[in-house]
Swiss-Prot record:
GO terms for molecular function: ATP binding; tRNA dimethylallyltransferase activity. Gene3D superfamilies: 1.10.20.140, Crystal structure of tRNA isopentenylpyrophosphate transferase (bh2366) domain, P-loop containing nucleotide triphosphate hydrolases. The gene is miaA. One of its GO terms (biological process) is tRNA modification. It catalyses: adenosine(37) in tRNA + dimethylallyl diphosphate = N(6)-dimethylallyladenosine(37) in tRNA + diphosphate. Substrate binds at residues 9-14. Catalyzes the transfer of a dimethylallyl group onto the adenine at position 37 in tRNAs that read codons beginning with uridine, leading to the formation of N6-(dimethylallyl)adenosine (i(6)A). Pfam families: IPPT (PF01715). The keyword Protease does not apply. This is tRNA dimethylallyltransferase. Keywords: ATP-binding, Magnesium, Nucleotide-binding, Transferase, tRNA processing. The record marks 98 as: Interaction with substrate tRNA. ATP binds at residues 7-14.
Amino acid sequence: MTLFLAGPTGSGKSAVAVELAEMLDAEIVSSDAYQVYRELPILTAAPSPADRERVPHHMVSIIPVQKNWNATEHYHRAMRCMEEIHARGKIAIVTGGSGLYFKFLSHGLSEAPPGDAALRAAFANCSTEALYARLSSLDPEGAASTDASNRRYVERNLEIVLAGGKPLSFWKRNWLTPPRGPGWVISRDVPELDERIAHRAARMMQEGAVEETASLGPCSATAERTLGLALIRSMLRGEISRENCQGQLALATRQYAKRQRTWLKREQWLRKLPASPSDSPRALAERIMEELGH
């Protein structure tokens, strides 16, 4: 059996997943695109050593920052982990905020064309608005389902259309199949989520995100996209103050969470799990247990 737990950054899904895994004697499989990097546990908000001691975690801190990573590689490796978990007679809990990675694990691998380095190089010279306009002209329906402000998704969807010669709907037909298991999405009021994100940004700065960034060697193109990495490097070069850096980190995280909420609204199969400031991770996990009939 596989369970899925989603939610925007800062919603508390990792803590809920740990509580739920303890209750079910389950193991956690991350669907986060950046927690795979060993050298970035603070910036990626990877599970703490204490949480990893409580519950087995997979797909966390498995590769160096010099290595590129993508959703297809993640899918194949995570699926092997899930097969091994099931072979031990245990439940797998998939959680993480990277939409495509999560979607592949819940609904299967898309047959879309692989990444095209030449196209990506050409995209680098274009604005997000220009890329989205081109996607709209080639595949209006696909563009309508694409977040125009999310450059990563705009680039990938345009890449699929150009390299594959077919609209997005053709490649995503496999996603019409039922999910591999039940899923929940943690939802919080936006002001509360924004406050949690502000505390998270402050905590990252206090707990070593600056030192973590300063100690990095060369990074792959994928690792370079880690949220906050460019901001802290700018601070280290003296271009912005520490206070400004923390504020911009919180802002960038809020913007990312907004994009995640937009994507999650389209995932109608996920059951809503409303959360308030008074709800502990354990209380939220207990509500999932009740819905599972435990």
